[in-house]
Amino acid sequence: MNLILTLLINTLLSSVLVLIAFWLPQLNIYTEKSSPYECGFDPMVSARLPFSMKFFLVAITFLLFDLEIALLLPLPWASQTTNLKTMLTMALILISLLAASLAYEWTQKGLEWTE
């Protein structure tokens, strides 16, 4: 009963906070807040610089590979367990997934900076 009550209160509280976060910014809509400010003058150039999509994709790829490698770090301690076959199977699956994703990135030309 306590678990259900706690989950219900947490769900209700988080839903209320999300709804408040969506409704409050819509009450104060000012065009001045969304425009670039340059000392009261009209802007000389656009303040919205284009972002390189290639850089973004390389950064996301780095984060994914970094997380997968972080999963490999506990393997030396896991090798001391009694169930060595399961540990080796999981390590092989993880390394295979890492190699397959690297091969996919390579074939899709995701690792080449210049086009």
From Swiss-Prot:
Q: Which UniProt keywords apply?
A: Electron transport, Membrane, Mitochondrion, Mitochondrion inner membrane, NAD, Respiratory chain, Translocase, Transmembrane, Transmembrane helix, Transport, Ubiquinone
One term of GO molecular function: NADH dehydrogenase (ubiquinone) activity
Chief subcellular site?
mitochondrion
* Gene3D superfamilies the UniProt entry points to: NADH:ubiquinone/plastoquinone oxidoreductase, chain 3
Which InterPro entries does the entry mention? Answer: NADH_UbQ/plastoQ_OxRdtase_su3, NDAH_ubi_oxred_su3_sf
The yes or no answer to whether the keyword Magnesium is present is no
* Locations listed in the record: Mitochondrion inner membrane
Highest taxon in the source lineage: Eukaryota
Kindly indicate whether the keyword Electron transport belongs to this entry.
yes
Catalytic activity reads: a ubiquinone + NADH + 5 H(+)(in) = a ubiquinol + NAD(+) + 4 H(+)(out)
Query: Which GO biological process categories is it annotated with?
Result: mitochondrial electron transport, NADH to ubiquinone
GO CC, sorted alphabetically, is:
mitochondrial inner membrane; NADH dehydrogenase complex
Mind telling me which residue stretches traverse the membrane in this protein? 3-23, 55-75, 86-106
List its EC numbers: 7.1.1.2
Q: By its UniProt entry, which Pfam families does this protein fall under? A: Oxidored_q4
Q: What is this entry's stated membrane topology?
A: Multi-pass membrane protein
Q: What does this protein do?
A: Core subunit of the mitochondrial membrane respiratory chain NADH dehydrogenase (Complex I) which catalyzes electron transfer from NADH through the respiratory chain, using ubiquinone as an electron acceptor. Essential for the catalytic activity of complex I.
Subunit structure, interactors included: Core subunit of respiratory chain NADH dehydrogenase (Complex I) which is composed of 45 different subunits. Interacts with TMEM186. Interacts with TMEM242.
The family classification in the record reads: Belongs to the complex I subunit 3 family.
Q: Under what name is this protein listed?
A: NADH-ubiquinone oxidoreductase chain 3
Q: Which gene encodes it?
A: MT-ND3
